[in-house]
Amino acid sequence: DCPSDWSPYGGHCYKLFKQRMNWADAENLCAQQRKESHLVSFHSSEEVDFLVLLTFPILGPDLYWTGLSNIWNGCSFEWSDGTKVNYNAWASESECVASKTTDNQWWSFPCTRLQYFVCEFQA
């Protein structure tokens, strides 16, 4: 079960944070919510559709941090929760990855950029 202020989907719980933070601070705030919580990771197009429905009505056309970065391994990207990248929607490449609320295209930015973010944990 998800806490009342989190949204359930596919055995996971999601929460949109309508405050802008850099990637590391956003990931830390996710972990402060629950120790198993991380910035969101995507593993199917259905999950992506759910995230568009969660984020777009609140943020409008904007971007939010995902857990995808190359901070831990400069050569390849991985989700902050340690899961493998088995679904992707690249628009470009860099260090930390934000997702677009309108079509879920991925955009890479310096990790210091301030963005909204979504946290996720397994229910």
From Swiss-Prot:
Tissue and organ distribution: Expressed by the venom gland.
C-type lectin domain: residues covered: 9-120
Domain of life: Eukaryota
SUPFAM superfamilies: C-type lectin-like
Gene3D superfamilies: Mannose-Binding Protein A, subunit A
Single GO molecular function: toxin activity
Disulfide bonds: C2-C13, C30-C119, C96-C111
Subunit structure: Heterodimer of subunits alpha and beta; disulfide-linked.
Family: Belongs to the snaclec family.
Function as written in the Swiss-Prot or TrEMBL entry: Binds to platelet GPIb (subunit alpha) (GP1BA) and functions as a receptor blocker for vWF binding to GPIb. The platelet GPIb-binding site resides on the GPIB-BP subunit beta and not on the alpha subunit. At a final concentration of 104 nM totally abolishes vWF-dependent shear-induced platelet aggregation (SIPA) at a high shear stress, but had no effect on SIPA at a low shear stress.
PANTHER family: MANNOSE, PHOSPHOLIPASE, LECTIN RECEPTOR RELATED (PTHR22803)
Protein name from the UniProt record: Snaclec GPIB-binding protein subunit beta
Lineage per the UniProt record: Eukaryota, Metazoa, Chordata, Craniata, Vertebrata
